[in-house]
UniProtKB/Swiss-Prot annotation:
GO terms for biological process: D-galacturonate catabolic process; D-glucuronate catabolic process. Transmembrane segments: none annotated. This is Uronate isomerase. GO terms for molecular function: glucuronate isomerase activity. The keyword Transmembrane helix does not apply. Belongs to the metallo-dependent hydrolases superfamily. Uronate isomerase family. It comes from the Bacteria. Pfam families: UxaC. It catalyses: D-glucuronate = D-fructuronate; aldehydo-D-galacturonate = keto-D-tagaturonate. Pathway: Carbohydrate metabolism; pentose and glucuronate interconversion. InterPro entries: Metal_Hydrolase (IPR032466), Uronate_isomerase (IPR003766). The gene is uxaC. It comes from Geobacillus stearothermophilus (Bacillus stearothermophilus). Its EC number is 5.3.1.12. The lineage of its organism: Bacteria, Bacillati, Bacillota, Bacilli, Bacillales. Keywords: Isomerase.
């Protein structure tokens, strides 16, 4: 009997098989947005068991377990690692239709040579087998990246990070995977957060004057950007609940900042103006340095107050947001473009309802000599939607409104060192989609041409777009 994960998994016709095996399969991986720990890579972390590797910090799995009524002690509580793995194994069969089902079995197959399906009957054998392998050489954090043919990844880093771990990795000639930092200044943007003033204090009292009329007073924040640039950073990353845009001069922005510093609660309009001013300032700085700006738009964070107090952030209690997007996004990009200060910008929309809105918007702000300067990327998997169907919809929407071949490829957005099978998953979906177009007579059977598009979407577009490792990049 053929195993569930086989060489033609998800490839539903001969055209898809040719495109995947001849053009996509062997390409390196560029994972330009993830949440891996640079410290764990620098130390080449070893994992004691599969619970550490698989379940530690993976709130996608936690959400699935909670949906089945699993007790929290088996998710984030004090149950033993073995008990937590067993609880996850019992959950897996009920995740059919969810990307977790496919990802789980792809990871078992690719890294541990396990063909069996994970469930209540097989969990102990798989637990013992995988744990035995984890104790061997070749199953450390770095080893998983090398096995996966990773070329470089982009981590997510606080402006206050000294990036010492990134530098230690870069100076190690035995490890060739590039670990590139990304500048994530959400703590400076979210002015109404209770932690805002404490964070600003850490940046230094000089930050208080950064919105005066002369741009030279923005030095505290600008200095961190330039520090990151010196350490190899070429990307910024912003998480935005909604897209702010309300025009605001430097003096007014400074007045709003001073009001917040003095302990006052800001109005929604004041918050929007501050965020707009800060984002525009940073975007212009990114442009001057040749950075890529990433905008993750539309996630409501920590919606369950009781569980947030109990477990903290990033534990599986975020949701897709709905709001007015077209006007503020167009206005923001236009404000930068009219001054020739729009950096390369990736717009991520969590809500599939905004696919056409964003795709039609980014088409307004392309540039001569830059392929896909402002692409759309739909973040997937984090809210238990069907990755496969959602990605097909996203790629089809992009093809309908824009240019499919400019898509900048896959990212994991993950905290796991075995998540790189998601790139394989994406590549199989892309090849199957194009293969289905050939099968239906919608595109010509030109494997060389279509194979080049597959390779661009899966690897070369990202390589060209980010220019990591290129002289000056």
């Amino acid at each position: 009997m053929q195993p569930f994960i086989h060489e033609n998994f998800l490839l539903q016709n001969k055209h898809a098989e040719v495109l995947y095996h001849d053009y996509a399969k062997s390409l390196p991986i560029i994972d330009y947005h993830c949440h891996l720990s640079a410290k764990e890579i620098a130390e080449d972390r070893r994992f004691h068991d599969m619970t550490e590797l698989w379940l530690e910090g993976d709130h996608y799995k936690w959400r699935a377990m909670r949906a089945l009524g699993v007790e929290e002690k088996y998710i984030t509580g004090n149950a033993s690692p073995e008990e937590k793995f067993q609880a996850w194994a019992k959950t897996v069969p009920y995740c059919i239709g969810n990307p977790l089902y496919h990802w789980t079995h792809l990871e078992l197959k690719r890294y541990f040579q396990v063909d069996a399906l994970l469930n209540e009957r097989t969990w102990r054998e798989i637990w013992n087998h995988c744990n035995d392998l984890l104790r061997q050489e070749g199953f450390s954090a770095r080893s998983f990246m090398v096995k996966s043919n990773v070329e470089w990844i982009g981590t997510t880093d606080d402006p206050l990070d000294d990036l010492a771990d990134h530098q230690a990795i870069a100076q190690d000639p035995s490890f060739l995977v590039k670990i590139v930092p990304s500048f994530r200044p959400d703590a400076v943007i979210e002015i109404n957060r209770p932690s805002f003033l404490d964070y600003v204090g850490k940046l230094g009292e000089a930050l208080a004057c950064r919105f005066m009329i002369t741009i030279s007073c923005c030095k505290p924040l600008e200095n961190r950007v330039r520090y990151f640039h010196e350490k190899g950073c070429r990307m910024a990353d912003h998480g935005l609940e909604s897209m702010p845009y309300s025009e605001c001069g430097w003096k007014e922005a400074n007045d709003i900042f001073q009001k917040r510093k003095n302990g006052f609660v800001l109005s929604r309009e004041e918050e929007e103006k501050y965020k707009t001013s800060t984002l525009c300032f940073l975007a212009r700085l990114y442009h001057s340095l040749g950075w890529v700006m990433q905008l993750h738009i539309g996630s409501i964070r920590n919606t369950n107050e009781k569980m947030f107090r109990r477990l903290g952030p990033n534990t599986g209690y975020d949701s897709i947001h709905d709001f007015f997007l077209a006007q503020p996004l167009n206005a923001f990009l236009n404000e930068l473009e009219r001054r020739d200060q729009l950096p390369k910008t990736i717009v991520y929309t969590l809500n599939p309802a905004y696919n056409y809105v964003v795709a039609s918007t980014v088409g307004n702000f392309q540039s001569e000599g830059v392929k896909g300067k402002v692409p759309i990327w739909r973040s997937l998997g984090g809210f238990n939607d069907s990755f496969k169907m959602a990605f097909i919809r996203h790629l089809t929407d992009l093809a309908n409104v824009g240019v499919f071949s400019t898509f900048v490829g896959m990212l994991t957005d993950s905290r796991s060192f075995v998540s790189y099978v998601r790139h394989e998953y994406f590549r199989r979906i892309v090849c199957n989609l194009i293969g289905s177009w050939i099968e239906k007579g919608e595109v010509p059977q030109d494997y060389d041409f279509l194979g080049k598009i597959v390779q661009d979407v899966c690897y070369f577009n990202a390589k060209q777009y980010f220019q990591v490792g290129v002289s000056g990049g």
